[in-house]
Swiss-Prot record:
Function: Apoptotic regulator capable of exerting proapoptotic and anti-apoptotic activities and plays crucial roles in apoptosis, cell proliferation, and cell cycle control. Its anti-apoptotic activity is mediated through the inhibition of CASP3, CASP7 and CASP9, as well as by its E3 ubiquitin-protein ligase activity. As it is a weak caspase inhibitor, its anti-apoptotic activity is thought to be due to its ability to ubiquitinate DIABLO/SMAC targeting it for degradation thereby promoting cell survival.
Quaternary structure annotation from Swiss-Prot or TrEMBL: Binds to CASP9. Interaction with DIABLO/SMAC via the BIR domain disrupts binding to CASP9 and apoptotic suppressor activity. Interacts with TAB1. In vitro, interacts with CASP3 and CASP7 via its BIR domain.
Entry comment, domain topic: The RING domain is essential for autoubiquitination.
Protein name: Baculoviral IAP repeat-containing protein 7
PANTHER family with a match to the protein in the record: BACULOVIRAL IAP REPEAT-CONTAINING PROTEIN 7, INHIBITOR OF APOPTOSIS
Post-translational modification: Autoubiquitinated and undergoes proteasome-mediated degradation.
Gene this chain is encoded by: BIRC7
Site positions per UniProt: Cleavage: D52, G53
Amino acid sequence: MGPKDSAKCLHRGPQPSHWAAGDGPTQERCGPRSLGSPVLGLDTCRAWDHVDGQILGQLRPLTEEEEEEGAGATLSRGPAFPGMGSEELRLASFYDWPLTAEVPPELLAAAGFFHTGHQDKVRCFFCYGGLQSWKRGDDPWTEHAKWFPSCQFLLRSKGRDFVHSVQETHSQLLGSWDPWEEPEDAAPVAPSVPASGYPELPTPRREVQSESAQEPGGVSPAEAQRAWWVLEPPGARDVEAQLRRLQEERTCKVCLDRAVSIVFVPCGHLVCAECAPGLQLCPICRAPVRSRVRTFLS
């Protein structure tokens, strides 16, 4: 913006200055008030990520390569979380879905999403894209295509024409949006605090590529969107920490030794094959275990 280290969010207006080491624009900006706060039809924080700034998706047209991938009858890439590849298991993960949630779990599970255990946050089992702040009338397939158009599960299930239609509709909305118009409720928001008590899921890092140039006379809405998603490539320490966290997540929480291979229904938590038979209650959430399903994590 100019003076000192002040910054301006293109959707929520002026933000606090005096940045400290470790401060992140996403944490400073996307607090509880901003979740699902529409600005001229654009939900700025619908696509969510962990507090470490992992990239989850971007609103952009499909590339020719992605179109070719989606046209095939088979999936050339494996799912990010194969343990939730079954629609039945995804639906079972909604056992603690908030009663106030506006979208039925059946629609979300059919669209590839499973519940993370946090509020109304869901993730796609294939592209690992995350969405939250659902409102009455939201269509999971449409939101999937809006935020994560290159998901191959989406392309195989709904087809390229559907994804193109959704992208074109929302591109028109972006084209009529003035990026410098400040909303009335542009007051600074407090940094968000993640909920605890539910095991973190593996988070693949994704590097976003800039695809469209700035429009003459100002910053285009597409440029503004990319400004929130771009992340520097992870360093060696980040990769090492991620691998260590992934190893811990795949270790049985009962014996703390063997790898998990059994998923409990309906809660969706994982334990090893040796510990599973003797458990009637999930050791993580204490929910009754109705059935057990063997799963293979790649």
